[in-house]
Amino acid sequence: MRLFYRYQDLAPQLVPLDYTTSPKVKVPYELIGSMPELKDNPFRQRIAQVFSQDGDGHMTLENFLDMFSVMSEMAPRDLKAYYAFKIYDFNNDNYICAWDLEQTVTRLTRGELSAEEVTLVCEKVLDEADGDQDGRLSLEDFQNMILRAPDFLSTFHIRI
């Protein structure tokens, strides 16, 4: 119930308190992205895109609940890894390529690395994690990399 009220508070003029008629309401990305839980996250737009039904960042109540479920501290590692992979796959081709990694590193470092440093980090990640050496990370490659990152579960979450 707390999440419903959190969703309703984002856009009280859009979201009815009585949901028995199953309205097709979507809270705009601008409101989702400005939530205290997301506003400082460098991936807030990608998170909203991945969890929104149409990929536009506008969320139904179900999308909103899914996002908080996956991003909760109690969600299983495999589920978190799957959604982290989708978030880092900026071009939505079901692989994390060098360009996706550049986007990820740039956001993680908030643009503080030079282009050469970003490229070096991306090359190192691919060297370490690209199991089949095809120049990109599959979901399986990514999951294997996550297994070696003990702090992944504690950092990939949103507290409400």
Swiss-Prot record:
Residue ranges of domain EF-hand in the record: 39-74, 76-111, 117-152
Sequence positions that bind Ca(2+) 1: D89, N91, D93, Y95, D100
Source taxon at top rank: Eukaryota
Sorted UniProt keywords: Calcium, Magnesium, Metal-binding, Repeat
Pfam families, per database record: EF-hand_7
Gene Ontology MF annotations: calcium ion binding; magnesium ion binding
Tissue spec. comment: Expressed in heart, liver and inner ear. In the inner ear, expressed in vestibule and basilar membrane cells. Expressed in megakaryocytes and endothelial cells.
Residues annotated for Ca(2+) 2 binding in this entry: D130, D132, D134, R136, D141
Additional detail: The binding of either calcium or magnesium significantly increases the structural stability of the protein in comparison to apo-CIB (calcium- and magnesium-free form).
Complex and partners: Monomer and homodimer. Interacts with ITGA2B (via C-terminus cytoplasmic tail region); the interaction is stabilized/increased in a calcium and magnesium-dependent manner. Interacts with TMC1.
Function as written in the Swiss-Prot or TrEMBL entry: Acts as an auxiliary subunit of the sensory mechanoelectrical transduction (MET) channel in hair cells. Plays a role in regulating hair cell MET channel localization and function.
Protein name according to UniProt: Calcium and integrin-binding family member 3
Organism: Mus musculus (Mouse)
